[in-house]
Each structure stands twice: as structure tokens, then as C-alpha cells.
């Protein structure tokens, strides 16, 4: 994996031990976990807030840099290493608890990200009736709740972040795989546990909005209208997992069509992790992709 440092140099294969490049359908959709040898040069370039460039010019900012002693021994001494975690540049302010309260009405996700300190612009956007993040709350959690109320997700594609409704995820071009390439998750309790049937109270303070469904958890959502309650029933449920040789086509938001010759199922990638082990400390190199695939549940 090619990792470019802030001075323009590239981490060599002898210094890079392992890396996992990951995309998710979450408010901060791109991250990199990396272990490198703790050389003097790298220690000076891999500190908190330092920049990295990976892939097709994807800019990441380091949010964690930790020195460790590894099991490998060289010249009678344990080899030192650095554990690095980096996220999409501009999103790092969202990882700290809010230093002040934010309350917005008739707003959008673009405005929410900006007010919370993120230095990015969303390609696709959705209007919001209201957004609240109190002082001391985690911005990413508050954004995720708002996304859930709009039946939407955040995704990274073609160098940009966008907010996309869950229904629209399945309208893109799909990648076709044989059913045997997937490990199917057969758990009848996943849907009943994951798809909560939310209820709310009308503005008059007495009428209950929403109706409980059989075999579903029931939860209370304050000040939610009928549209939002309906959106809360529309979720992505993990149905399968795929592990294969490195396949950089698989990223969060990619549509996968599973074909067994007689029928086809459409799934979307919830999380994709691309793993690179260089074998710098011994062992064989590994380049592999693991993806978690989900199906839309709830009314479309």
C-alpha cells in the first residue's frame, strides 16, 4: 500500500508492517489503521495532526500515534513500532466531544458539519428540520441519529463525501459475485433486535404516534413526526460477509448483486476493510479484502 507522508516521501515496504484501509457508511466514512517501524524519520512525520495521502489522493489526518514494543528482536533489542490511526482530513473535529451546544432549525447536513467544525463540503445533501448537539455530546453520534431519522447514510465515493438516502444506494451500478463467494449470516434474531419500532407523542401531549409491530423491539423517540418514525423503520441489516483477495472495487456504499444462476439478490457494502501485511517482520505478505454486506429492511 502506498502511503505518502507530509514531506512527500513514501513509507517503504521495509518500514510498513501492516495497514487496514476502511470505509463505512458513517459520519466519518474513511479511516486508516497502520503499524510501522518506529524509525527516527517516521517518528518525526507521524505525529498527531500530521497528514497522509493514500490511494487516489485521499488525504487523511492522524488522530492517534502510539509507540509500542513488538515481539520481533533485532540486534538484541525489541523492535519499536508506531500504531497510527488516521481519518479523512477535515473530519477530525467531529471525533471530540462538543465544546459548545449547537441548535439548528430548517438546516442541512452541510450546515451541520460546518457548524460542528468539520472542514469538508458534502457533495450530496439532505434538508433537516432540526439538529441539536449539546455541549459534551459526541458530534458523530448526533449526526448518526439525524441520518437515521432521514433514512440516510454518509458515504465516500469518487473523492467526495455525500449524504444519500438508503433507498438510493441500490440504484447505482452493481458488482456481480457468485453466491458461493459470500458467507451468509443466518440469525433470525438479528432483524428483531436491530429494527426497533419507535413511538412518539404528538404535539398535543396525549396522542401516541406510530404503532407497535409484532416481534420488534419498541422504543420511544421524543418529538418525532410520523415521517421520521417511518424512516426509523428503514434500516440496513447485515446479511453476509465476503473475504477475498484484495478487491479495491468493494467500498462502503458499493452495490453487490449475488447471482446463483436462478435468482439475484442486491446487497450494499456496509463496511469494507482492505488489509495489507508486508511480511516485514517475517511471515508471508497478505493483501485481502473483507466486506460486510447488508440488505434493506423496512418499507421502501
Predicted regions: what is each one?
Residues 1-18:
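Polar/acidic, low-complexity leader/linker segments enriched in S/T/G and N/D
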Residues 37-120:
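Surface-exposed cap/loop segments at beta↔alpha junctions
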Residues 34, 97-120, 135-158, 253:
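Amphipathic, non-transmembrane alpha-helical segments in extracytoplasmic/periplasmic proteins
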Residues 77-82, 122-194:
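Short beta-strand-centered interaction patches in the first periplasmic/extracellular domains
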Residues 3, 48-60, 253-261:
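Short conserved beta-strand and strand-loop elements enriched in small hydrophobics
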Residues 65-76, 167-170, 268-281:
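Short, compositionally biased
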Residues 94-110, 140, 156, 167-178, ...:
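Ser/Thr/Pro/Gly-biased, low-complexity, turn-/loop-rich segments
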Residues 17-45, 186-300:
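An acidic/polar, Gly/Ser/Thr-rich interaction patch typically located in mid-to-C-terminal regions
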Amino acid at each position: 500500500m502506498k502511503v505518502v507522508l507530509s514531506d512527500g516521501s513514501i513509507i517503504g515496504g521495509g518500514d510498513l508492517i501492516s495497514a487496514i484501509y476502511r470505509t463505512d457508511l458513517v459520519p466519518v466514512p474513511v479511516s486508516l489503521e497502520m503499524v510501522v517501524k518506529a524509525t527516527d524519520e517516521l517518528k518525526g512525520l507521524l505525529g498527531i495532526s500530521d497528514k497522509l495521502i493514500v490511494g487516489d489522493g485521499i488525504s487523511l489526518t492522524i488522530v492517534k500515534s502510539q509507540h509500542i514494543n513488538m515481539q520481533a528482536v533485532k540486534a538484541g533489542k525489541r523492535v519499536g513500532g508506531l500504531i497510527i490511526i488516521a481519518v479523512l482530513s477535515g473530519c477530525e473535529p467531529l471525533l471530540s466531544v462538543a465544546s459548545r451546544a449547537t441548535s439548528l432549525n430548517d438546516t442541512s447536513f452541510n450546515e451541520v458539519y460546518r457548524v460542528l467544525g468539520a472542514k469538508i463540503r458534502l457533495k450530496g445533501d439532505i434538508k433537516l428540520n432540526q439538529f441539536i448537539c449539546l455541549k459534551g455530546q459526541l458530534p458523530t453520534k448526533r449526526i448518526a441519529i439525524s441520518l437515521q431519522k432521514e433514512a440516510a447514510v454518509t458515504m465516500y465515493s469518487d473523492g467526495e463525501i455525500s449524504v444519500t438516502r438508503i433507498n438510493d444506494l441500490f440504484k447505482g451500478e452493481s458488482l456481480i459475485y457468485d453466491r458461493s463467494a459470500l458467507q451468509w449470516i443466518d440469525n433470525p434474531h438479528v432483524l428483531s433486535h436491530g429494527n426497533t419500532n419507535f413511538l412518539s407523542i404528538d404535539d398535543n401531549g396525549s396522542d401516541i404516534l406510530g404503532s407497535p409491530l409484532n416481534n420488534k423491539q419498541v422504543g420511544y423517540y421524543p418529538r418525532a413526526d410520523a415521517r421520521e418514525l417511518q424512516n426509523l423503520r428503514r434500516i440496513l441489516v447485515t446479511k453476509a460477509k465476503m473475504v477475498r483477495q484484495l478487491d479495491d472495487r468493494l467500498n462502503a456504499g458499493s452495490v453487490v448483486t449475488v447471482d446463483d444462476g436462478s435468482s439475484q439478490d442486491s446487497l450494499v457494502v456496509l463496511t469494507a476493510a482492505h488489509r495489507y501485511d508486508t511480511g516485514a517482520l517475517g511471515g508471508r505478505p497478505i493483501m485481502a479484502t473483507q466486506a460486510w454486506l447488508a440488505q434493506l429492511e423496512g418499507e421502501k
